[in-house]
Amino acid sequence: MGALTIGVVTRPFTFEGKRRTRQALAGIENLKEVCDTVIVIPNDRLLQLGDAELSMMEAFRAADEVLYNGVQGITNLITIPGMINVDFADVRSVMADAGSALMGVGSARGENRVMTATEQAINSPLLETTMEGAKGVLISVAGGSDLGLMEVNTVSYTHLRAHETL
């Protein structure tokens, strides 16, 4: 049909049981057969983000937010014009027939905001593996009118440096 299909899903927490995990893994394998790209967020990684006081509802809400941000991020790449536009053809060239994919997100304010956000995205605890062997990378930078040219360059340079050391 020619449509670009991207699946963004979670893998259950270990405490949800082996049966649920088996079902999820089978579903993920099925998705890989029909989707160009599948991004799997392991819910267990959320345990590294939260504190001991995080309730079950907050944990599941956090998992849902990660999924939402993943879908929204990809959608925004295509639909929201930026200073350096990424269009559907760019997204398709990286994600078509890509198989498994990773997604890192970073956010920061103030001094060293770009470096902090970039390092958060590259080293995100939600990433199950590294970028090693990546065939393509999509980078999206959002900022206010004060976002500087050198800051944007820092994102690209930091990513390249991280990718070279893998």
Regions flagged by a language model, labelled:
Residues M1-E164:
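Tubulin/FtsZ superfamily GTPase core signature
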